[in-house]
Regions:
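Active-site-proximal helix/loop segments of hydrolytic enzymes
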Residues: 1-102
Length: 102
């Protein structure tokens, strides 16, 4: 939620509930599950999230097919705002204070 909020503050339009969706695959069928869904799922999601021994997030915040996303985040400034949003979200997760921007 921290990352979704930071990306929204940086100018991104959020998709899903508060910018968070879970995706599960059953064979070839893709199923989106909104963040408000509380049922424990047995289906695997993405291997990168399932087979790691540390906290992991797979984030997708911009689409190259979206003129709005490209305009907001395709520049050097947009990349810096995105990097800052990720950095601050990671700091919040580990309960550390981010260093000030230069």
């Amino acid at each position: 939620k921290q990352l979704a909020g930071a990306m929204q503050a940086a100018g991104a339009s959020l998709r899903g509930r508060g910018g968070i969706r879970y995706i599960y695959y059953q064979g070839e069928v893709k199923q989106l599950v909104e963040s408000s869904h509380k049922e424990v799922r047995v289906e695997r999601s993405f291997t990168i999230l399932e087979d790691v021994n540390c906290p992991a997030v797979l984030a997708e915040q911009c689409f190259v097919t979206s003129d709005t996303d490209v305009a907001q985040f395709g520049s050097e400034d947009g990349c810096k705002r995105t990097a800052r949003a990720y950095y601050e979200a990671i700091c919040a997760y580990f309960e550390t204070t981010p260093l000030p921007e230069e």
